[in-house]
Amino acid sequence: MDEKSISKAVIRRLPRYYRYLGELLEEGVERISSNELSSKMHVTASQIRQDLNNFGGFGQQGYGYNVRYLYTEIGKILGLDTVHPMIILGAGNLGQALANYVDFEKRGFKLVGIFDVNPVLEGIAVRGIEVQMLSDLPLFLKENEVEIAVLTLPKNKAKEMAKILIENGIKAIWNFAHIDLDAPEDVMVENVHLSESLMTLSYNLSEYRKEHETME
């Protein structure tokens, strides 16, 4: 099936499949049925089969799924079988936390540069990489291969830097700034708003309290 016809919902479930299959491998599980995977992921078995059929199925009638094979194949679909050079713009608390998250490198996301506007941070080492000034970014992009840029900047600076990134050929931006970035069709932007997830949790907590107050 043409990848363009695969829904965003399916794509967003793939990392969950990958994560759960990785956990199964660590537990020594060699094969699993769609029903067993359904119970673990809280997704219907039918949905799992439909999702995986978009990419060829991978299962065998009466056998289920070979966990290691499926884990490897989903990793390939997600592009985790290649190295993705990555930079972080913003060396504050969030930027440094992301830089220090070692699992990114295990998945092929290799940090090659960190930048910030604050001269106080210039030269400090984060995971062995010295923080550079944002003014050095255009030259760095010309001299180094970079696929992904992570933005953890204030929103007024993020828009400006996104423009520079795009002008210098960056095609993938992971944006943590408090602004949704607009970009050309050939540039992929993943906007992440951490506070929205927390507000969703707050709503669910409020509803839970209302429900239990009514029952008392």
PLM feature segments, named:
Residues 121-124:
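A glycine-biased structural micro-motif
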Residues 22-25, 129-216:
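Phosphate-bearing ligand-interacting subdomains
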Residues 1-30:
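Extreme N-terminal segment that seeds HTH/winged-HTH DNA-binding domains in transcriptional regulators
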Residues 31, 35, 40-83:
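HTH-adjacent hinge/linker in prokaryotic transcriptional regulators
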Residues 76, 100, 163:
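Short, well-ordered alpha-helices that flank and scaffold nucleotide-derived cofactor binding pockets
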Residues 79-118:
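Glycine-rich adenosine-cofactor-binding loop
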